[in-house]
Amino acid sequence: MTAEAAGRYATALFELAKSEGAAEAVEADLAALRAMLTESPELADALASPLHAVEVKAGILSALAKKAKFNVLTANAFGVAARNGRAGDLGDLARVYAALAAADRGVVTADVQTAAALTKKQTEALAASLKSAFGREIEVRTEVRPELMGGLIVKVGSRMFDSSLRSKLDGMKTAMKEA
């Protein structure tokens, strides 16, 4: 899903959920979906695959929403996304929705990718450091990406800080090719 499309879907869902008093429930549902997609690459692949019909993807999402007891607005949004060929992009929609909900609460969201899981103490220290830098309350969302090899990538709004070992090695590789 393009950032623009994810923004449109997420904004529409957020406004509807907020007007229905279900913004937090939908946010929790979408966070659960993101976790499912991360934990089950097979699910993510099935939703993104052009080999599966729209109806199959809609059925998968409907069953998932029912089993997880998701809010009806979340389930309906899954159906709309599937019918419009966007089932594979629900992770992006969930990410944008979370940012909208956090902004509505006056909290800035920091997406942090690390090679290994951060401890609670490390996450709290990072949040405090980011709060000091941005002057606002920070909500840290972490994602483990072993391919980074070490270090971390922090994305806050349109700003990104990449201190991963992978990017440093890629930079060295490029410099060596140019030499």
Swiss-Prot record:
Q: Provide the topology term for how it sits in the membrane.
A: Peripheral membrane protein
Q: Gene3D superfamilies from the entry?
A: N-terminal domain of the delta subunit of the F1F0-ATP synthase
Q: Where are the transmembrane segments?
A: none
One GO MF annotation is: proton-transporting ATP synthase activity, rotational mechanism
GO cellular component entries: plasma membrane; proton-transporting ATP synthase complex
The entry's family comment says: Belongs to the ATPase delta chain family.
Task: Give the InterPro entries listed for this entry.
Answer: ATP_synth_OSCP/delta_N_sf (IPR026015), ATPase_OSCP/dsu (IPR000711)
Q: Where in the cell is it found?
A: Cell inner membrane
Q: Which domain of life is it from?
A: Bacteria
This protein's assembly is summarised as: F-type ATPases have 2 components, F(1) - the catalytic core - and F(0) - the membrane proton channel. F(1) has five subunits: alpha(3), beta(3), gamma(1), delta(1), epsilon(1). F(0) has three main subunits: a(1), b(2) and c(10-14). The alpha and beta chains form an alternating ring which encloses part of the gamma chain. F(1) is attached to F(0) by a central stalk formed by the gamma and epsilon chains, while a peripheral stalk is formed by the delta and b chains.
Extract the PANTHER family matched here. ATP SYNTHASE DELTA CHAIN
Q: What is this protein called?
A: ATP synthase subunit delta
Q: Which gene encodes it?
A: atpH
| Keyword check for Lyase | no
Q: Which UniProt keywords apply?
A: ATP synthesis, Cell inner membrane, Cell membrane, CF(1), Hydrogen ion transport, Ion transport, Membrane, Transport
Q: Which SUPFAM superfamilies match?
A: N-terminal domain of the delta subunit of the F1F0-ATP synthase
Per its database record, what is this protein's job? F(1)F(0) ATP synthase produces ATP from ADP in the presence of a proton or sodium gradient. F-type ATPases consist of two structural domains, F(1) containing the extramembraneous catalytic core and F(0) containing the membrane proton channel, linked together by a central stalk and a peripheral stalk. During catalysis, ATP synthesis in the catalytic domain of F(1) is coupled via a rotary mechanism of the central stalk subunits to proton translocation.
